[in-house]
Curated annotation (Swiss-Prot):
It comes from Salmonella dublin (strain CT_02021853). Pathway: Amine and polyamine metabolism; carnitine metabolism. SUPFAM superfamilies: Trimeric LpxA-like enzymes (SSF51161). This is Carnitine operon protein CaiE. Keywords: Repeat, Transferase. The lineage of its organism: Bacteria, Pseudomonadati, Pseudomonadota, Gammaproteobacteria, Enterobacterales. GO terms for molecular function: transferase activity. Residues 180-198 have a biased composition (Basic and acidic residues). Belongs to the transferase hexapeptide repeat family. Residues 174-198 are annotated as: Disordered. One of its GO terms (biological process) is carnitine metabolic process. InterPro entries: CaiE, Hexapep, Transf_Hexapept/Carb_Anhydrase, Trimer_LpxA-like_sf.
Length: 198
């Protein structure tokens, strides 16, 4: 793991969290219990404070940053998809930010909301609970359904379990030169399926 103190502030990581060795945490970063931080994530707490609350995840290639005297927060069970950028914003409890989305300064994503992949949420947006946000700039399309929220929660549970699995089952290795016969497949811990299979 790449942890850096910045002007006396040292990142704080709960012992039950998993931070991939290629992720970078700088300065004023606080990571809660059961959090998963994926490969190549960058958390630059060199201006504002960055907080990932318990059970949340920040996947591969995500960026968190913010201005001085601001907090960038992912609340409990928040789910941040691959490549998303969070800058000086707040993501509510149990909300999902889709892959490659950008959430700008002062924006608030309401609890149990979903931001669709590739969306751009403008600075200062003030969301409410259970909104489905889509587009660039993002607009409220409708309310999140119970089925969508269930799907989101299953995915978040997978990442909470992945944090545990990675702490015990991930190790650096050298590759094989060819696939072994009857190579096993990995399994998740829930019955979650991609949306295309629903």
């Amino acid at each position: 793991m790449s942890y850096y103190a910045f002007e006396g502030l040292i990142p704080v990581v709960h012992p039950d969290a998993f931070v991939h060795p290629s992720a970078v945490l700088i300065g004023d970063v606080i990571v809660g219990a059961g959090v998963y931080i994926g490969p190549l994530a960058s958390l630059r707490g060199d201006y504002g404070r960055l907080i990932l609350e318990a059970g949340s995840n920040l996947q591969d290639g995500c960026i968190m940053h913010g201005y001085c005297d601001t907090d960038t927060i992912v609340h409990e069970n928040g789910h941040i998809g691959h490549g998303a950028i969070l800058h000086g914003c707040v993501v509510g409890r149990d909300a999902l930010v889709g892959m490659n989305s950008v959430i700008m300064d002062g924006a608030v994503i309401g609890e149990e909301s979903i931001v669709a992949a590739m969306s751009f949420v403008k600075a200062g947006f003030q969301g409410e609970a259970r909104q489905l946000l889509v587009g660039s700039p993002a607009r409220v399309l409708r309310q999140v359904t119970d089925q969508e929220l269930h799907w989101k929660r299953l995915n978040t549970k997978e990442y909470q379990d992945l944090a545990i699995r990675c702490r015990t089952g991930l190790s650096e290795t050298k590759p094989l030169t060819q696939a072994e016969e009857n190579r096993p497949r990995l399994k998740g811990t829930t019955d979650v399926k991609p949306k295309s299979a629903q």
